[in-house]
């Protein structure tokens, strides 16, 4: 059944329709769309078989793309293979993951980095990949923490977190993008306005900031402050402007107050001008960061009026235009990225949220209310050609972000698109009142879009980015390079300093060295574990019974754990990652003694000599 187009909307007379579209948005229930014409079973079977063939990647073969999906309230990033939609791994960032030994033990570098940056939890929304010459380069991934005003950098050489930094003066670090073409900055939008200068509760003092961070160190270099909220971010391609959608120019403190005006804006920040103002000392230093107040220094931020409460902000691959999705308007506003003039405002459907691109001049916009992806031609829309709408496909259900492969670069691939849906409503086996998140893979290589797969994920991906295997796979490390602090085979030792004990330990199939050590009850124990394996994927773990300790140590890696020894007795430690036929035998003892009892600082105290047969009794 072909869906009718939404009624025409004159942006100048948007007021009369604001209630209709606003309430259509907030109460829209996900609908399953069924075809009116019954399909011939053979044709349907052939279509299903064709889709299955497209996404099938045989065991032992590799996917064409890495897909990085933000984890939302799970606090990390999920990695999938495309087109198979196979879950590959999670990159934990703002939340501990005991199974991966991430930030779950005192003493680990990941715990210290996370603790020093703020709360032990985060809300990740927008993954961003580094680029060189308009193409992904496979070096870095950046991600925001909306809840706690932080940004993290992941080193894609190891898929490890390299940096986490708190951004001063910001609440709701939401939209995130890399400043192009250099990536010398990543910039992040402060969505939640507040008084960051005087710390009052008076809304008259509320402001938000857009912060520019060094792309490597994540140190905040400067900020631009303004009244209102900044939502999604995107960069021009020539180093001049970066763009953000801005809503709540009313400075309202309730949902009703935030939608009173018929027009909000896209903000264009002149980055070279901002740098010049900072260099000339015209910014005010607030909480250690130069802040440019755009209300006092004109020109650094230009507001381009668009329909109220815009959401998505996307720059086209050629850098000519920036698109602002209407959300409460059934339109997408097309803005010249150089003149900052609106050139068109085509209607696309109900609840447009985000747009992405192929390599043939087409735009794909997610429609939250319609539960669709709509394909439309950019140049035709600009010229006013009524045939600009090309295709629509139903998704399941209530899509938020959508992202095509390579769409953030100057060279999109034009083959695959992911629809990140907000509700699944029976798409998967029931697992309780809450259902898994639903993502769908869409083939966009032809004239017509085709949904070829649906796959669940943990909660809750907001955005995604896809990079070719050819760009990244060969750059990923086989093993870690042993750091200088690493304990080498034959250098294991126990060092005691009063009530503090350090154990310098190695692990290799299938043995911990030492296999025992002695401590007093209440001692502060730090284990420095080094995996001396040289073979990829030979990970070892270290769990200590009844002490809540689990380390994960990849080949060539060192990890530390600090804890307090419990009551007297024997506590076994063992390897938590299956590594060999003698995996169960890969264990040792922590011998905890009462204060005053003698303890040994030698390796393997209390061990039974290998040539002595232990006593045993059998029934």
Residue ranges, per PLM feature:
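Extracellular/periplasmic metallocenter environments
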Residues: 489-492, 553-619
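Bacterial N-terminal signal peptides that target proteins for export
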Residues: 11-23
């Amino acid at each position: 059944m072909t869906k009718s187009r939404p009624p025409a909307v004159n942006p100048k007379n948007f007021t009369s329709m604001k209630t209709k579209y606003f309430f259509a948005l907030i109460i829209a229930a996900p609908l399953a769309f069924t075809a009116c014409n019954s399909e011939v079973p053979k044709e349907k079977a052939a279509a299903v078989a064709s889709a299955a063939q497209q996404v099938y990647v045989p065991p032992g073969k590799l996917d064409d793309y890495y897909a990085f999906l933000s984890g939302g309230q799970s606090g990390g990033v999920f990695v999938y293979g495309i087109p198979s939609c196979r879950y590959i791994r999670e990159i934990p960032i703002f939340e501990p993951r005991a199974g991966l030994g991430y930030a779950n033990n005192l003493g680990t570098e990941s715990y210290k980095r996370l603790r020093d940056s703020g709360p032990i939890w985060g809300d990740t929304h927008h993954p961003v990949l580094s680029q060189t010459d308009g193409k992904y380069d496979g070096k870095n991934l950046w991600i925001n923490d909306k809840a706690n005003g932080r940004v993290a950098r992941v080193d894609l050489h190891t898929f490890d977190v390299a940096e986490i930094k708190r951004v001063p003066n910001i609440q709701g670090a939401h939209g995130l993008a890399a400043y192009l073409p250099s990536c010398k900055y990543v910039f992040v939008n402060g969505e939640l306005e507040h008084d960051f200068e005087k710390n009052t509760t008076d809304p008259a003092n509320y402001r938000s900031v857009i912060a520019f961070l060094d792309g490597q160190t994540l140190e905040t270099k400067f900020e631009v402050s303004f009244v209102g909220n900044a939502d999604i971010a995107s960069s021009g391609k020539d180093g001049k402007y970066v763009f953000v959608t801005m809503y709540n120019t009313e400075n309202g403190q309730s949902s009703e107050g935030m939608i009173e005006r018929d027009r909000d804006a896209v903000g264009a920040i002149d980055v070279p001008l901002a740098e010049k103002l900072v260099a000339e000392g015209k910014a005010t230093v607030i909480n250690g960061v130069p802040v440019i107040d755009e209300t006092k220094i004109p020109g650094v931020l230009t507001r381009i009026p668009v329909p109220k409460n815009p959401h998505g902000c996307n720059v086209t691959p050629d850098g000519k235009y920036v698109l602002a999705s209407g959300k409460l308007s059934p339109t997408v506003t097309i803005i010249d990225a150089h003149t900052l003039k609106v050139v068109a405002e085509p209607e696309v459907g109900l609840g447009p949220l985000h747009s992405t691109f192929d390599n043939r001049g087409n735009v794909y916009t997610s429609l939250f209310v319609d539960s669709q992806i709509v394909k439309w031609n950019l140049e035709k829309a600009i010229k006013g050609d009524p045939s600009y709408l090309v295709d629509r496909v139903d998704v399941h259900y209530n899509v938020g972000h959508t992202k095509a492969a390579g769409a953030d670069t100057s060279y999109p691939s034009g083959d695959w698109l992911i629809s990140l849906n907000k509700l699944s409503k029976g798409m998967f086996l029931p697992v309780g009142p809450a259902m898994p998140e639903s993502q769908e893979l869409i083939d966009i290589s032809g004239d017509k879009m085709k949904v070829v797969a649906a796959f669940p994920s943990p909660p809750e991906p907001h955005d995604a980015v896809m990079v070719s295997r050819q760009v990244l796979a060969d750059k990923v490390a086989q093993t870690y390079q042993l750091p200088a602090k690493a304990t080498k085979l034959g250098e294991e030792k126990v060092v005691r300093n009063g009530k503090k004990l350090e154990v310098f330990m190695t692990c290799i199939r299938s043995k911990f060295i030492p296999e025992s050590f002695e401590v007093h009850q209440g001692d502060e124990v730090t284990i420095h574990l080094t995996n001396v394996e040289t073979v990829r994927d030979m990970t070892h773990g270290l769990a200590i019974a009844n002490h809540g300790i689990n380390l994960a140590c990849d080949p060539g890696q060192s990890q530390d754990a600090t804890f307090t020894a419990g009551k007297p007795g024997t506590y076994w430690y063992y390897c938590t990652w299956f590594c060999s036929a003698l995996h169960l035998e890969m264990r040792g003892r922590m011998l905890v003694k009462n204060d005053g009892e003698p303890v040994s600082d030698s390796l393997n105290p209390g061990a039974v000599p290998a040539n002595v047969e232990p006593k045993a009794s059998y029934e």
